[in-house]
Swiss-Prot record:
Residue intervals of the Helicase ATP-binding domain: 77-251
All copies of domain Helicase C-terminal, residue ranges: 277-436
Name of the protein: ATP-dependent RNA helicase dbp4
Originating gene: dbp4
Motif Q motif, chain ranges: 46-74
Biological source species: Aspergillus terreus (strain NIH 2624 / FGSC A1156)
UniProt subunit comment: Interacts with the U3 and U14 snoRNAs. Associates with pre-ribosomal complexes.
Skewed-composition ranges (Basic residues): 706-715
Ranges for region Disordered: 1-24, 493-541, 589-615, 695-804
Keywords: ATP-binding, Helicase, Hydrolase, Nucleotide-binding, Nucleus, Ribosome biogenesis, RNA-binding, rRNA processing
């Protein structure tokens, strides 16, 4: 018999090893949780090993060559490990990506998150390129974890993403595609989400993504940890309320710094007229062929035109272009090539302005003025990253200089002015004109670039910087190689709007001149000769007044249309009454025959006739309805039209004692004063109503959310049933049909037609006399029908025939 301490072999040894390993993992996890709870937030950390991090995270950081913490990482990671909401703000290139990726991995690891737990962390990025960059860093740092991570951006197959989305624990995505999956993917749930991260939060929370982000947040649970990171962080209460942040920790490591940009960045600006911008840019590229440069423009059409034009001119350095209209594969190839290149020029829109980490960028050129100081900070942040050196140049038109410098000064951005040497400046205006003349496509691109630039200036909100009327657009079009400035509709619309809103006095200043009068007369005569279209408003103004006061007005005017003099004497009135109209009779009126010599008899008879024609109908109203015309008679037939003549109904409410009261009753003055001051009562009433509406709004939102959730669950249940049915149909195996031997045991019914059988054909064979006849012969076609098997004797005879 083996001793008690002998080592175990086989199945028992493996199970004991698994038990020990599980026990060791649980002990490490409990100690890690205890270290996080004991973490001092005021302590400063310098290395990643000083933080309470798990072994897989430390191994991933070490393999990716991350050893020391940056300022934003040192302060933000400790708060995030504690589960607090964070608003992180730091300069560009300070390592904000790791500041939120490490807490995401650690918090899910401590909760032992697995595939069946669903989505645990959601990371939103404003651009596809930044999302790809975050995902690559996540893959490097989290390579030793067992989480499933996914990248969800536009430009890829939706069905492929839908099949894999339900199995993901961490998602890096753009807002638009994420909302599409939340609405359409049945097997994707976010009810168990633990963390929400917004990189470049100020860009995501602005007007461009507002509706999309609100819709995404509506799908997420309120009990979650939320982290916002950006170089220019938002502090708006409305934005924070939309994200349901709970006592967020504001981490701004460079808030007290002298400048908002890195100290290793040299920043300059050049004042140049708009038509000379391309000439100076070409001269700059030609003089810096051994450097890596990014050129920012305001629109994608400008990027395409400048890229195509400079590509034809061949400056002697690789040229690339990046804008939002490109397909996802092309954008990814361009960013990869530019990252790997040592010397290149990239023409780009603001797609590349935020978050992208291009290594060893020497120059950032802003050919067009940025919309605000925040955009400037993000653009120049593509260089001078991680304490490297970098240089930036801003091109400003003379009309933009004062306003932009003022905005940069408010954001603590130091910029120095430099001048361009005249002997190094080269003009490419004639070459561009020659190329546009020979190539219609390039000319078309130039026209579109001109229009898009003018439109980008026109839509800017800061009119202190962007003054469209001060720009020399004709010369700018000529500098692009165009024969003339294209027509722009919205500028013409502004002129017509100004003419329309001009005061009338200004419009009539020139009416005293004889020449203008003659021109007006000619225009009027032309208008009279031309056929005019009469509208319903014209017919309305031509209609005669049928109001009650029409008769009084006719008495106030003379026969020639002039107003009667109210200060005239009675004698003048008597003279006028001599031939004035006293009464009008219709043709065939009986009163003409009777006549009347005196005014009194006429007036009496008129009153009598009036009394005969007038009817009075009492309805439920304040005053009776007078029927004095056929129109009023028709009015009696319409209940709908009579409603406005009837009084409004009164609604009564009953108190607890059963006494009837009107809905709105006026209080006595003493009762009103007993309740306090009027302003205090007003404040109390407004507060009570606000609280009531707030509670009702919460209930309504919860009801709508519940209905939406139920509808989505029903739709997902239907899709699950369809998927299950498809899987069952694929797994079903068809049974083979029964053999002929089994069929021969049963006799066919009388209704069925007799089925010929190969075995039944043998019944025609008779015992052969010779061997040759016994040999099997080919079956011949026979018109005779086979004999049916009806009795047991027929079956026996068939069997004997088969046995021979």
């Amino acid at each position: 018999m083996a001793p008690a301490n002998a080592p175990r072999n086989g199945k028992y040894a493996k199970s004991s090893q698994r038990t020990l390993k599980r026990k060791r993992v649980q002990e490490d996890l409990s100690s890690l949780v205890q270290r996080v709870e004991d973490l001092d937030l005021k302590e400063s950390f310098k290395a990643f090993t000083d933080l309470p991090l798990s072994e897989p995270t430390l191994s991933g950081l070490s393999a990716s060559h991350y050893k020391t913490l940056t300022d934003i990482q040192s302060r933000a990671v400790s708060h995030a490990l504690k589960g607090r909401d964070i608003l992180g703000a730091a300069k560009t290139g300070s390592g904000k990506t790791l500041a939120f990726l490490i807490p995401v991995l650690e918090n899910l690891y401590r909760k032992q998150w697995a595939e069946h737990d669903g989505l645990g962390a959601l990371i939103l990025s404003p651009t596809r390129e930044l999302a790809i960059q975050i995902f690559e860093v996540l893959r490097k740092v989290g390579r030793y974890h067992h989480f499933s991570a996914g990248l969800v951006i536009g430009g890829k197959s939706l069905k492929e993403e839908q099949e894999r989305l339900g199995k993901m624990n961490i998602l890096v995505c753009t807002p638009g595609r994420m909302l599409q999956h939340l609405d359409q993917t049945a097997l994707f749930d976010t009810y168990n989400l633990q963390m929400l991260v917004l990189d470049e939060a100020d860009r995501i929370m602005d007007m461009g993504f507002q509706k999309t982000v609100d819709a995404i947040i509506g799908h997420l649970p309120k009990e979650r940890q939320t982290m916002l990171f950006s170089a220019t962080q938002t502090k708006k209460v409305s934005d924070l309320a939309r994200l349901s942040l709970q006592d967020p920790e504001y981490v701004a490591v460079h808030e007290a710094a002298a400048s908002a940009t890195p100290s290793t960045l040299q920043q300059h600006y050049v004042v140049t007229p708009l038509p000379q911008k391309l000439d100076i840019l070409w001269s700059f590229i030609r003089s810096n062929l051994k450097s890596k440069t990014i050129v920012f423009l305001s629109s994608g059409k400008q990027v395409r035109f400048v890229y195509e034009a400079f590509r034809h001119l061949q400056p002697g350095i690789p040229l690339m272009h990046l804008h939002g209209r490109q397909k996802q594969g092309g954008r990814l190839d361009i960013t990869t090539k530019y990252s790997q290149a040592k010397h290149a020029v990239l023409f780009s829109t603001d797609v590349a302005a935020r978050g992208l980490d291009f290594p060893a960028v020497d120059w950032v050129i802003q050919l067009d003025c940025p919309e605000d100081a925040d955009t400037y900070i993000h653009r120049v942040g593509r260089t001078a990253r991680y304490e490297r050196d970098g240089r930036a140049v801003l091109f400003l038109d003379p009309s933009e200089e004062q306003g932009m410098l003022k905005r940069l000064e408010q954001k603590k951005v130091p910029v120095e002015k430099i001048n361009v040497k005249a002997n190094k400046q080269q003009s490419i205006k004639n070459q561009l004109q020659n190329m546009c003349f020979k190539d219609p496509e390039l000319k078309y691109l130039g026209q579109k670039a001109f229009i898009s630039y003018v439109k980008s200036v026109y839509v800017q909100k800061d009119k202190e910087i962007f003054k469209l009327k001060d720009l020399d657009l004709e010369e700018f079009a000529s500098s692009l190689g165009l024969p003339g400035a294209p027509r722009i509709k919205f500028i013409k619309g502004d002129d017509t709007k100004e003419r329309k809103n001009a005061p009338r006095a200004v419009a009539h200043l020139s009416s005293d001149d004889d020449e203008s009068d003659a021109e007006d007369d000619e225009k009027k005569s032309k208008k009279k000769d031309a056929p005019q279209v009469r509208t319903k408003y014209d017919r309305m103004f031509e209609r005669r007044n049928q109001d009650v006061l029409a008769g009084h007005y006719t008495k106030l005017i003379n026969d020639d249309g002039t107003l009667a003099d109210p200060k005239a004497t009675d004698e003048a009135d008597e003279d006028n009454d001599f031939l004035s109209v006293k009464r009008r009779f219709d043709a065939g009126d009986k009163q003409l025959e009777v006549g009347g010599s005196s005014d009194e008899s006429g007036s009496d008879s008129e009153a009598e006739t009036g009394k005969k024609d007038v009817k009075v109908v009492n309805i439920d109203g304040k005053e009776p309805l007078v029927i004095d015309s056929k129109r009023r008679e028709k009015l009696l037939k319409s209940k709908k039209k009579l409603l406005k003549f009837k009084g409004k109904g009164t609604k009564l409410i009953y108190d607890d004692e059963g006494n009837a009261h009107e809905i709105y009753e006026m209080e006595d003055e003493e009762q009103f004063r007993a309740k306090g001051d009027a302003k205090e009562q007003q404040a109390r009433f407004l507060a009570a109503e606000a609280e009531r509406t707030r509670l009702a709004d919460v209930e309504d939102k919860e009801l709508v959310k519940q209905k939406r959730r139920e509808k989505k669950e029903k739709r997902k249940a239907r899709e699950r049933e369809l998927l299950a049915q498809e899987e069952q149909e694929e797994m079903l195996v068809q049974l083979p049909p029964p053999e002929d031997d089994d069929q021969g045991r049963f006799s066919p019914s009388e209704d069925e037609a007799p089925r010929p059988s190969k075995k039944q054909r043998v019944q025609f064979a008779e015992p052969a006399e010779s061997e040759e006849e016994r040999r099997p012969k080919k079956p011949k076609k026979s018109t005779a029908e086979p004999k049916e098997i009806q009795t047991l004797e027929d079956l026996e005879s068939l069997a004997t025939g088969l046995l021979g």
